[in-house]
């Protein structure tokens, strides 16, 4: 699974990106998104005249007027990424704010989208996210207008494939929100069935014209949350059409981009806050389709609110959060890579492992530090002494099913256990409702 950091929010107009890219690289990220919102931010379209004058005063290129100069704008960013061996495999075109109503905005978006796709191709990207047109378009005409819009990329794509027949490039559609009097509701392509219909029609046509399918889908988790949708259902419909996932957080009502797990609310009468995003649905939904494509960590609003002096520490923590998601999403792949599996722990987490993966990847046994339980059977497994881990078959993975991960790992390493040690967590189980067992730690 490829982890990509979205640098939007780190710098203005891609100016002096070296220090910021250095921090991103030092945090452990190896891939960056060419987010063209940095070159042409949404605020440009809210106050066009003022933004145009400000850009002129600062010597910046005002891309809505000169979209073909986008390559000049992004060059410092691309040079910095190359300097730090940061891969840039994907891009996203500029977006128009959802509250705009002047249909002339669509002309700007068309020109900027074409320029963005060309820029992404020249930068060596494999795909570019191109949001649909929406400003002032009646609901009944949205599909007709946008199918025509996406087909208009065929000449650019044909030219690219003629020059680079062995390379791949895709245009990714993305689920959107819609502004209704200041409230965000479900927008274009938020319905998974509708998205699949669009993709089938577009790819059928691209197959005829280009000899290959060139359209895919980028699933934005933040938009799913705002629309109040269940990712379990969406992913099953979209399936293999999903070529990228934007991992971000928000409060469920505003289209912000926050670091995952940082948005939480306490409802009336609640004793503790709960996450504003249904992370169980997110993780389970992507696991269900064995998603293994690019994950884009988008946290532009978190980046903007943190002082620059502690940004390196923020980026390091962001990498930890991103790694957690990759671990959760690829849990089954981790289990499957071993010929044999053994568990450490004989409680709720062990039971969770057996409910989710026990039938497909039956462990040899489990073990526990509680001597009084040795020889007991739990969830179809015999509970053994940790000492038995010293004599395991080759290619065995030991999965710690206990929240005291660090202590148990240190215990096993001090014993001289040679097998690989992995972690398991039941925080986001595949199996639905389950009652936790109690009293398993007691001597009986």
Task: Label the model's feature ranges.
Residues 1-122, 151, 211-214, 319, ...:
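N-terminal pre-domain/capping segments
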Residues 1-7, 14-28, 118, 124, ...:
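Histidine-acidic metal/acid-base catalytic patches
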Residues 6-10, 35-39, 93-96, 133-135, ...:
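Active-site beta-loop-alpha junctions enriched in small/polar residues
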Residues 49-50, 61-72, 104-112, 138-152, ...:
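Alpha-helix N-cap and loop-to-helix initiation/capping positions
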Residues 83, 97-216, 226, 320:
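Active-site acidic/histidine proton-transfer and metal-coordination neighborhood
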Residues 84-86, 125-126, 167-169, 289-293, ...:
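A short helix->loop->beta-strand "cap" motif at the edges of active sites that frequently abuts
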Residues 314-444:
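Hydrophobic, well-ordered beta-alpha structural blocks that scaffold small-molecule cofactor pockets
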């Amino acid at each position: 699974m490829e982890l990509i950091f979205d640098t939007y929010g780190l710098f203005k107009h891609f100016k002096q990106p070296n220090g910021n890219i250095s921090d991103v690289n030092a945090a452990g990220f190896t891939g960056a998104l060419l987010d063209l919102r940095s070159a042409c931010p949404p605020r440009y379209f809210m106050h066009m005249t003022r933004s145009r004058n400000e850009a002129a005063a600062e010597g910046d290129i005002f891309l809505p007027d000169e979209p073909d100069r986008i390559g000049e704008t992004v060059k410092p960013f691309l040079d910095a990424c190359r300097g730090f061996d940061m891969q840039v495999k994907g891009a996203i075109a500029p977006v128009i704010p959802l509250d705009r109503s002047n249909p002339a905005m669509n002309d700007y978006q068309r020109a900027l989208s074409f320029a963005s796709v060309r820029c992404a191709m020249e930068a060596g990207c494999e795909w570019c996210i191109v949001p649909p047109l929406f400003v002032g378009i009646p609901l009944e005409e949205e599909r007709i207008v946008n199918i025509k819009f996406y087909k208009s990329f065929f000449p650019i794509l044909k030219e690219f494939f003629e020059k680079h027949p062995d390379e791949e490039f895709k245009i990714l559609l993305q689920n959107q929100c819609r502004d209704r009097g200041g409230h965000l509701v479900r927008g274009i392509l938020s319905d998974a069935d509708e998205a699949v219909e669009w993709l089938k029609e577009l790819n059928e046509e691209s197959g005829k014209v280009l000899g290959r399918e060139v359209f895919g889908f980028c699933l934005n988790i933040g938009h799913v949350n705002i629309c109040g949708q269940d990712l379990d259902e969406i992913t099953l419909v979209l399936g293999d059409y999903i070529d990228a996932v934007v991992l971000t957080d928000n409060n469920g009502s505003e289209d912000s981009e926050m670091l995952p797990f940082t948005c939480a609310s306490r409802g009336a009468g609640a004793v503790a806050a709960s996450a504003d995003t249904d992370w169980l649905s997110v993780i389970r939904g992507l696991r269900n389709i064995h998603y293994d494509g690019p994950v884009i960590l988008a946290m532009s609003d978190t980046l903007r609110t943190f002082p620059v002096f502690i940004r390196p520490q923020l980026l390091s923590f962001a990498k930890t959060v991103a790694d957690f998601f990759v671990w959760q999403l690829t849990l089954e792949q981790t289990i499957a890579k071993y010929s044999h599996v053994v568990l450490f722990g004989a409680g709720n987490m062990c039971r969770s492992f057996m409910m989710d993966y026990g039938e497909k990847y039956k462990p040899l046994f489990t073990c526990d530090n509680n001597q009084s339980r040795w020889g007991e059977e739990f969830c179809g497994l015999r509970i053994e002494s940790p000492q038995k881990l010293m004599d395991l078959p080759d290619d065995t993975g030991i999965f710690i099913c206990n929240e005291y991960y660090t202590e148990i790992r240190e215990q096993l390493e001090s014993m001289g256990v040679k097998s690989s040690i992995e972690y398991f967590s039941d925080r986001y189980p595949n199996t639905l409702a389950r009652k936790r067992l109690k009293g398993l730690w007691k001597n009986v």
